[in-house]
């Protein structure tokens, strides 16, 4: 049976890209999916049965490597986390929240800071470039871009080949503008910042995977849920690469790096090996997880 990847889901139809035959098949789901409570997602690898050259039925959904609830997409290889230098203001707390979420899902993060052309005063630019160095030192890929000038895009595009990539980030940071600059044929709608609220309006309605630069890219509505619902206390440290690396030297196994004695992570913070603001965010997120209502 032929196989392909679902690149769009709309009104009960699933559009399957069969690269071996270089065509897209419009498929319906079978009742067995509803019976087994399986919802096919954009990004799923699917086995299908063709009725003709253009239409068919989904028969099976292959096992997923990961699955995001919002946006509903699966088998994501990497996420370009788009944050603006200004309008809205750059936030390391929000960036770290996104990083934790993608790391927890086994997705490779790429950080993109856009609108650098709007950070007019030298102090703002200097502060942001300092953060860029911090995140690069941790091991993250970080790119500084200006969508209007099309600068800094080459570095991001080189990551797309043979990958499924999502763009995510705070509303109003220019995700659609950035994708339009990368692939002008997308013609994705963009909205200016709402002057009343100081934040952007979501302009993307549904998730669709689009061929560009040798890979598949989704312009998503961003993560509308930023809660750590699937992350347990003992798992949080593994989503901070620098904590994950140093925690092996903690005296106690299962150290949460809070009040435990002889904690290598706390020592690394004191000695400047781990940025204090990253550790503060770790503690904030840990508290959030601890206060989460028990799940039954």
UniProtKB/Swiss-Prot annotation:
Signal peptide: none annotated. GTP binds at residues 114-117, 169-177. It is an enzyme of class 3 (hydrolase). The keyword Cell division does not apply. SUPFAM superfamilies: Nucleic acid-binding proteins, P-loop containing nucleoside triphosphate hydrolases. Its EC number is 3.6.1.-. GO terms for cellular component: cytoplasm. InterPro entries: G_CP_dom, NA-bd_OB-fold, P-loop_NTPase, Ribosome_biogen_GTPase_RsgA, RsgA_GTPase_dom, RsgA_N. GO terms for molecular function: GTP binding; GTPase activity; metal ion binding; rRNA binding. Its cofactor is Zn(2+). This is Small ribosomal subunit biogenesis GTPase RsgA. It comes from Bacillus velezensis (strain DSM 23117 / BGSC 10A6 / LMG 26770 / FZB42).
């Amino acid at each position: 049976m032929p196989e392909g990847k679902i690149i769009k889901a709309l009104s009960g139809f699933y559009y399957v890209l069969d690269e071996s035959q270089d065509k897209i098949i419009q498929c319906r789901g079978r009742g067995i999916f509803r019976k087994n409570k399986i919802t096919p997602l954009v990004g799923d690898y699917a086995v299908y049965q063709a009725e003709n050259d253009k239409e068919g039925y989904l028969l099976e959904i292959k096992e997923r490597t990961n699955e995001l609830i919002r946006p509903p997409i699966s088998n994501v290889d990497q996420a370009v986390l788009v944050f603006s230098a200004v309008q809205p203001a750059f936030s390391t707390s929000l960036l770290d929240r996104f990083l934790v979420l993608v790391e927890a899902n086994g997705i490779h993060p790429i950080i993109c800071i856009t609108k650098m052309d709007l950070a007019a005063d030298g102090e703002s630019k200097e502060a942001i470039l300092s953060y860029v160095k911090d995140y690069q030192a941790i091991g993250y890929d970080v790119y500084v871009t200006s969508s209007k000038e099309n600068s800094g895009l080459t570095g991001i595009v080189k990551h797309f080949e043979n990958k499924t990539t999502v763009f995510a980030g705070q509303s109003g940071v220019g995700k659609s503008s950035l994708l339009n600059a990368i692939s002008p044929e997308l013609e994705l709608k963009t909205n200016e910042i709402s002057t009343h609220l100081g934040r952007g309006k979501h302009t993307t309605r549904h998730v669709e995977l689009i061929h560009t630069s040798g890979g598949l890219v989704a312009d998503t509505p961003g993560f509308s849920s930023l809660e750590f619902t699937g992350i347990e206390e003992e798992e949080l440290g593994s989503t901070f690469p620098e904590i994950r690396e140093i925690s092996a030297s903690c005296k106690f196994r299962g150290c949460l790096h809070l009040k435990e004695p002889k904690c290598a992570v706390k020592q690394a913070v004191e000695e400047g090996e781990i940025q204090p603001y990253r550790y503060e965010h770790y503690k904030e997120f840990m508290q959030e997880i601890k206060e989460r209502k028990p799940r039954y």
